[in-house]
């Protein structure tokens, strides 16, 4: 019987720990403040921003919402970020992605002060991760490491396969597993003999962006499967990149969708807010 890794419960534990930490900081007259910028009214982005605001409220983190119209120019957005960079009372800045086509994402990410880069996307944050230095960690991969550790799953010495090579999940995930002394392979759309590689994995992280792509033919008996995907199927039901029902009886542990990786991403964003405020700001 597979262990169902409960991201909701584990993220709740982390938020409770952070709530106590923020309360302690407040008793010293120190405040953690996150500025969240959203351009346009993409429904999914609006939901994510709402979830981040709720998590801030729960942890005692002050949040500032900047809801900009879709026609906001790149220059206007960069000017706002620079204003927030200069504000001593703002300890973290997050720009909700994706951005409209007329705004260059990389330019926006690079404009955020690396000391306030709570998403962990700035080249300075990514560089620190790649050479093993302390710094902001990309939230989803950091959340996955916490899921594994807090579920008693050892990473050291394990054969780890990451399916997907995005800058947000795949690449930083591989680096974090390497940092934990896993033996890491990255697969992607051009990988040949994919199932031969995935069937070697003790820990398989699936972030490929295709609904129910991973079936039991790709998984060895007793593997741990982490599903990063989030989609709606033809019946409007949430599902991941893993065909959960097909795989669940073959694995030793698996994350569900929803309730697995998703809540951890927000918990680790809150963790980054507190970490950064303490390290750089207050």
UniProtKB/Swiss-Prot annotation:
Residues binding NADP(+): 164-166, 189
CDD domains recorded: NAD_bind_m-THF_DH_Cyclohyd (cd01080)
One GO BP: purine nucleotide biosynthetic process
Cleaved signal peptide residues: none
Pathway where it operates: One-carbon metabolism; tetrahydrofolate interconversion
EC code: 1.5.1.5, 3.5.4.9
Record's subunit section: Homodimer.
Function (record text): Catalyzes the oxidation of 5,10-methylenetetrahydrofolate to 5,10-methenyltetrahydrofolate and then the hydrolysis of 5,10-methenyltetrahydrofolate to 10-formyltetrahydrofolate.
Identification of the protein by name: Bifunctional protein FolD
Gene source species: Lachnoclostridium phytofermentans (strain ATCC 700394 / DSM 18823 / ISDg) (Clostridium phytofermentans)
């Amino acid at each position: 019987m597979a262990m169902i890794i409960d991201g909701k419960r584990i993220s709740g534990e982390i938020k409770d720990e952070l709530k106590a930490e923020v309360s302690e900081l407040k008793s010293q007259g120190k405040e953690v403040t996150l500025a969240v910028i959203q351009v346009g009214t993409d429904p999914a982005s609006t939901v994510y921003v709402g979830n981040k605001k709720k998590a801030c409220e729960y942890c005692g983190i002050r949040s500032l919402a900047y809801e900009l119209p879709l026609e906001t120019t790149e220059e206007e957005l960069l000017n706002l970020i620079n204003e927030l960079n200069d504000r001593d009372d703002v300890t973290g800045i997050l720009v909700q992605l994706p951005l409209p086509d007329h705004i260059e994402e990389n330019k926006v990410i690079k404009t955020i002060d690396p000391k306030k880069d709570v998403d962990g996307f700035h080249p300075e944050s990514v560089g620190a991760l790649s050479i093993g230095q302390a710094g902001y960690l990309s939230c989803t991969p950091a959340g996955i490491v916490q899921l594994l550790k807090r579920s008693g799953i050892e990473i050291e010495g394990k054969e780890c396969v990451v399916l997907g090579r995005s800058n947000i999940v795949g690449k930083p995930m591989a680096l974090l597993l390497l940092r934990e002394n896993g033996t890491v392979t990255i697969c992607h759309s051009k990988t040949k003999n994919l199932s031969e590689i995935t069937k070697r994995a003790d820990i398989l992280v699936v972030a490929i962006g295709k609904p129910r792509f991973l079936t039991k033919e790709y998984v060895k008996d007793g593997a741990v499967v982490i599903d990063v995907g989030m989609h709606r199927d033809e019946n409007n039901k949430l599902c991941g990149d893993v065909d959960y029902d097909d795989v669940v009886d073959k694995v030793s542990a698996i994350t569900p969708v929803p309730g697995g990786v998703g809540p951890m991403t927000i918990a680790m964003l809150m963790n980054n807010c507190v970490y950064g405020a303490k390290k750089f700001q207050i």
